[in-house]
């Protein structure tokens, strides 16, 4: 049963040079218990997509359809969304979040402030303890200040803060960035445990190897568009879009294959899409790529590439 459905989602920022087309015509569905991975280069729209879902797009606007738990999120008033959805049903682990802890308050004080902000009036002590232990932290962490914690501990505190009101869906934006490999593994194992317990995630990352551990479905973002969407198995075993193929070929493997890089630079998001976003970097570009490609259906999703026009 579908619990998150996105149709024709657009998100734009205003700038002195005109609108920034950060998210352009994105579609995907998730069923209960499923998690999605969003991958792509920096500034491709990944974080904006996550912020659009939780309606925290500072300086920007979104339009289209986001159906979550049978409610049209974008049609709700800010007060309704804040009272009934934000942090209660959908929450977010922000990019670089472990640096956002307030240095002058203890961890416990910061948990209490979150609960106050979201109008919680139950047993806060019990809820905070439950949240801390769910991410494998000792309760003595609550009396400490952020500077007394390691990077991995701070990241787990941030995850616990996102989970404190037991949301159904958590958006995790680069949760392993700036952590060493050992701590990255601990965070990934924690997310896998939470997923096994029934929580759904949107994991935003530039690292496709990380997504292979958690994601049931994967969306590949490029130039503000989701150029390919499908099951994790299909994306890894039979990637369709040349950009997806390039990303996978850039991953080092134990087989000794030499990683390849994708030449060129991403397009400016100040330009409204009028042709394939990947045309200037694509080794397989054809004349038809000068037109904006539609979404061609695949076995488990879709691909935005004219090479599959004959297969629709």
What are the language-model segments listed below?
Residues 62-75:
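Conserved ABC transporter NBD signature motif
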Residues 73-91, 117, 234-239, 269-273:
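ABC ATPase NBD coupling module
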Residues 123-140, 248:
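Conserved ABC ATPase "signature" region
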Residues 142, 229-312:
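Short catalytic/signature loops enriched in Gly
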Residues 145-149, 153:
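Conserved ABC ATPase signature
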Residues 164-168:
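A short, proline-enriched helix->beta-strand linker immediately N-terminal to the Walker B motif
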Residues 171, 175-257:
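P-loop NTP-binding/switch modules centered on Walker-like glycine-rich loops
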């Amino acid at each position: 049963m579908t619990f998150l459905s996105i149709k024709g989602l657009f998100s734009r920022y205003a700038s002195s040079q005109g609108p920034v087309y950060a998210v352009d015509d994105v579609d995907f569905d998730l069923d209960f218990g499923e998690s999605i991975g969003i991958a792509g280069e920096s500034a491709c729209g990944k974080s904006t997509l996550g912020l659009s879902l939780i309606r925290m797009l500072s300086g920007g606007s979104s339009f289209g359809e986001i159906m979550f738990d049978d409610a049209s999120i974008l049609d709700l008033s800010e007060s309704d969304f804040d009272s009934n959805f934000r942090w209660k049903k959908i929450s977010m682990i922000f990019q670089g979040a472990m640096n956002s802890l307030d240095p002058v308050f203890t961890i416990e004080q910061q948990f209490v402030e979150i609960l106050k902000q979201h109008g919680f009036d139950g047993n806060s002590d019990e809820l905070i303890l439950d949240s801390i232990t769910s991410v494998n932290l000792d309760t003595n962490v609550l009396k400490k200040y952020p500077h007394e914690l390691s990077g991995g501990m701070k990241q787990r505190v941030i995850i616990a803060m996102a989970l404190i009101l037991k949301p159904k869906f958590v958006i995790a934006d680069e949760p392993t960035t700036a952590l060493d490999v050992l701590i990255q593994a601990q965070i990934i194992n924690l997310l896998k445990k939470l997923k096994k317990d029934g929580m759904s995630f949107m994991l935003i990352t530039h690292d496709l190897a990380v997504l292979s551990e958690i994601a049931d479905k994967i969306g590949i973002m490029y130039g503000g568009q989701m150029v390919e969407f499908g099951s994790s198995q299909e994306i890894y075993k039979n990637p369709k879009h040349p950009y997806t193929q390039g990303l996978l070929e850039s991953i080092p493997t134990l087989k000794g294959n030499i990683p390849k890089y994708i030449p060129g630079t991403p397009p400016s998001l100040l330009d409204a899409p009028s042709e394939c976003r990947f045309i200037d970097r694509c080794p397989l570009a054809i004349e038809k790529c000068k037109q904006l490609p539609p979404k061609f259906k695949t076995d488990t999703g879709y691909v935005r590439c004219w090479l599959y026009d004959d297969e629709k």
